[in-house]
Curated annotation (Swiss-Prot):
Assembly behavior: Interacts with BSRF1 tegument protein; the BBRF2-BSRF1 complexes oligomerize and might play a role in tethering the viral nucleocapsids to the host Golgi membrane during secondary envelopment.
Keyword DNA-binding (UniProt): no
A Pfam family reported for this protein in Swiss-Prot or TrEMBL: Herpes_UL7
Organism of provenance: Epstein-Barr virus (strain B95-8)
InterPro entries: Herpes_UL7 (IPR002600)
Subcellular location: Virion; Virion tegument; Host cytoplasm; Host Golgi apparatus
Family indicated by similarity: Belongs to the herpesviridae cytoplasmic envelopment protein 1 family.
Keyword Secreted on entry: no
GO cellular component: host cell Golgi apparatus; viral tegument
UniProt keyword terms in alphabetical order: Host cytoplasm, Host Golgi apparatus, Virion, Virion tegument
Protein name: Cytoplasmic envelopment protein 1
Function: Plays a critical role in cytoplasmic virus egress. Participates in the final step of tegumentation and envelope acquisition within the host cytoplasm.
Amino acid sequence: MASGKHHQPGGTRSLTMQKVSLRVTPRLVLEVNRHNAICVATNVPEFYNARGDLNIRDLRAHVKARMISSQFCGYVLVSLLDSEDQVDHLNIFPHVFSERMILYKPNNVNLMEMCALLSMIENAKSPSIGLCREVLGRLTLLHSKCNNLDSLFLYNGARTLLSTLVKYHDLEEGAATPGPWNEGLSLFKLHKELKRAPSEARDLMQSLFLTSGKMGCLARSPKDYCADLNKEEDANSGFTFNLFYQDSLLTKHFQCQTVLQTLRRKCLGSDTVSKIIP
């Protein structure tokens, strides 16, 4: 997924730019830190107030502190197609999911902050239209400073997630001027509409379009499941793995056992990459 090759001007780079615009979204973004025998994957703290105003100074300081920390390993993320993200389930085979998950550690502070904002978006339990607008504005500025393939991928993905939140929660209802949102994740729109449908139709449609058994069972408690994995595998890895996140619309996949297994394996044993798109 990542390499040290530089793009030559012309057709190759144009083709890559087209690939970035496809409906592929960075998901399940967490900050990964290791210290002694402890590995922790956690959401980025909420650097915003109740009105949705971003605390850019503290956010920037947090990101810069991560960059110079010997404990910081990078941001774990997975690239998902629009059709694979079914809100409560993932329509993707485990080996493909594993190949898509990376531990990303860019050398650029602006790319680091874009990852931090993505994590904040996904873990927002009660997002407001003010927060969504502030985050999008900040992402636009950060992307303009980088203007490379990774920043484009992160920007497009974050805009899609913000649009998903705005439309799913009707955050812009009654607004005089619509924001610069796109359609968001398509199956989240279906999920929202099915909540209003009669139970018979809802159950049938959910089983057809929003349910997949490819990734296996859900964990009753992600925290307890990770603790069980630690008991089983600590002797081999030498590390204890801990997961922290906020239960929100965009973090349901952390309840999947295969997601937790893959996340643990990647955080403990995966090499970092400095580029998402080579």
